[in-house]
Amino acid sequence: MMTTMTRTNSNHPVLIDCDTGIDDALALIYLAGLAAAGEVQLRAVTTTAGNVDATQTALNSAHILRLCGLPNVPVVAGVPTPLVVPLVTTPETHGPHGLGYVIPPETSTDTIAVTPGERPDTVPVGVPAAATGGDERGRRHRA
C-alpha cells in the first residue's frame, strides 16, 4: 500500500520556555528552521535558570536567534535562579556562559511587561523537557 503525505503550511504560533545552554541552543536552531519553512511563528522565548542563571540564558537565546536570522523575536528572562533549590552550575562542563566555551557577545534582550493574569496573546507553549533533562514538572534529572 502506498501512502501519500501532503504538507500543509500550518504556521503554528509558538512560545518556548528554555534554559538555553547547548541542548536548547539546538532546539532554538531547529525552531528557527521551522520558522523559515513557514511551519511555525516563533512568537517569543522565555528563559529559566539551568546551567547558568536566567539572565545569561536570555542572552544566549538572543545570540542564537540573531545568528539564525530572527533578531526580532522577543526574549524574556524569567526568575534568575530556581525558587526552591539553590542554582547549581558546572562551568567546567558547560562553560562560563552555558554554551560550552562559546562566548556570546553582550546582547540586550527585549522584554514584555505583562500584568499577572493578563495575556498579551494566546500561544501554545513548547517546553523541551526531554531535551533539557527535566521532567514535566520542570525538575532536573541529575546523573
What name fits each language-model region?
Residues 1-143:
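N-terminal acidic, glycine/proline-rich low-complexity segments
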